[in-house]
Amino acid sequence: MLRISRALRGSRTVGLVRARSVLSSNSTSLRYFSRLPTCYQEKTNNSTTTIPWYLKVGDRERALKQSIFKAQEINYPSNSPDSLRHISQYLCDELGLSDIIIFDLRKGEFETAAAKISDFMVIATARSPKHCQTSFDKLNSLIKQEYESVAYVEGQFNAREEKKRQRRLARKPKLSSNSTSNVPTESWFLIDCKVDKIFVNILTENRRQEINLEELYAPEHERHKYERKESSVEGREAPQEDDILAGLRRLVNQRRQYSTVAPSVVLCRQLLANLESSDFNGAISLINNNREYSLNFMKTIHDWVSGLEIDAAKEIPWKKWVTTFESCWPLVLPEESASLYWSLRMNFFKMINIADKEHYNINQFFNDYLLAKKSLGYPITSQDLIEFFKLTIINVRGDGEKSRGYWEIVNRNALVSRALRLVEDVKDGNSIVQDGTLVSMLLRTMVSGEEEVPNHMLHATYEVIDYLVDTFGAAMDPTAIGGVLEVLAAARSWNKYMAFWEAGVGGLVPGEDHRPWSQFIKLVVDSGDSEMIRKLLSEGHLLWLKRFEVKMTDDIKEQLDRLFEKGYSQGLWFEELKEHIYV
């Protein structure tokens, strides 16, 4: 015991000696530290502490996590359904989600697709990606049990997929070395509950801070509460900092800002502003610098032209607009959207022709659309021909007295012949002749002027009609029959009109007469030709309605009533015929 006590007294003596030596040596260090710049000293007595930015990174990250979403009671919108309250309380009480906010989207204009199809947008914070996944699984189970529905989720990345990803990276060392798989995945689950148009967003805290969905869905008068504000103190650089450290500071401070407006929308607005201010050079320059948005630019120009009034359209410099539109056309059309490009092109040039025929005629449309499409290796379809024939008819009937000469319509029809030659299988004639709408429109291009007065008709029209009768007879398409009747009625060729109508009668059987009877009677009544009306009533043509057991539709009855009224006004009485047909 004496030896132990002596040893302890000796160790205490040695400890005191060593402590004195350490204090004496540290006095030099303290004197040296006092000579350092003041930015590295901690001041007291009503002074602040100045610390370099690279020592405050951890504090900054902790500050970012202090959001405005404090623990609070859930505020429900007025007149909200019970399902919303049930789901929200389940998220809070059972799943442990925090900072739950509900936005009422029933009123207001929102640009996002989710906002347009939802009434309530719920946003909640989870503690981890695993918490997000578990919360979705349990919420989906609740929806199945309580509401007999299945939720739809976007952004799901479960543990099984994470394990597959890890195994794939393990097999490829290069990918694994460059991967940030050791960093926890930041999750965002967007869930359509399929109940009362309720959508739920479950996000991790950092992800919620980064995306800031609240600013997107908040009402206009509350949006300022959720705007992201960057600290101005942290963004201030000290003049004595090294350039490398300043670059690192900017790298740490940067945060990606998400925009809810697509770049194409901004560029299209700028394009429209240039065109409305007649800055065509600026518009073409904008298009050339953003070739990837060519389809969006074409839609913008097309929609603007379609919204013009007829009176204002005549004052538009169409040549410059056409040049701007052509500059949108890509050198190589993408196959997946080629049909959209051609559809926009056809409609755009059609609108220009209708708006200003003097400066953009039908020949220019033929070159800019049909010939251009054929030269680029795309086939001319039946719909292309139908639209071209319609436009030709509009141009012919809109030119007044100029279009009523026989040789004028011959010249017009030469362009129609050129269009037909562009069809690859035109030699067979099957694709054209068997299309009733196409035949009808083709025949209408062979008649000039308005339908209310006698018009010129090409001699070749009769040859085409005879060919149709010989080829198809009673099996001719009803639409084609209607087209032939309109052409013959417009030319007042009534003998040919009646001969064509009865040409295929021999091949008909009761119950199989599908000819357009209402159109046949209507054209005669609209013509006002008293001789033709008397002939139709007195020569027994209407008796075929009973012989072939034609179904008496409302349209046929309406036209028959008009026909008999015309006969009464001319002193013709056919009460027995009327009763026989209507019975």
UniProtKB/Swiss-Prot annotation:
<dbReference type="InterPro" id="IPR043519">
    <property type="entry name" value="NT_sf"/>
</dbReference>
<keyword id="KW-0496">Mitochondrion</keyword>
<feature type="compositionally biased region" description="Basic residues">
    <location>
        <begin position="165"/>
        <end position="174"/>
    </location>
</feature>
<keyword id="KW-0809">Transit peptide</keyword>
<dbReference type="GO" id="GO:0005743">
    <property type="term" value="C:mitochondrial inner membrane"/>
</dbReference>
<feature type="transit peptide" description="Mitochondrion">
    <location>
        <begin position="1"/>
        <end position="29"/>
    </location>
</feature>
<dbReference type="GO" id="GO:0140053">
    <property type="term" value="P:mitochondrial gene expression"/>
</dbReference>
<dbReference type="InterPro" id="IPR025210">
    <property type="entry name" value="ATP25_mRNA_stabil_dom"/>
</dbReference>
<comment type="function">
    <text>Probable mitochondrial mRNA stabilization factor.</text>
</comment>
<dbReference type="InterPro" id="IPR040152">
    <property type="entry name" value="Atp25"/>
</dbReference>
<feature type="region of interest" description="Disordered">
    <location>
        <begin position="163"/>
        <end position="183"/>
    </location>
</feature>
<dbReference type="Pfam" id="PF13929">
    <property type="entry name" value="mRNA_stabil"/>
</dbReference>
<protein>
    <recommendedName>
        <fullName>ATPase synthesis protein 25, mitochondrial</fullName>
    </recommendedName>
</protein>
<keyword id="KW-0999">Mitochondrion inner membrane</keyword>
<dbReference type="Pfam" id="PF02410">
    <property type="entry name" value="RsfS"/>
</dbReference>
<keyword id="KW-0472">Membrane</keyword>
<comment type="similarity">
    <text>Belongs to the ATP25 family.</text>
</comment>
<dbReference type="GO" id="GO:0048255">
    <property type="term" value="P:mRNA stabilization"/>
</dbReference>
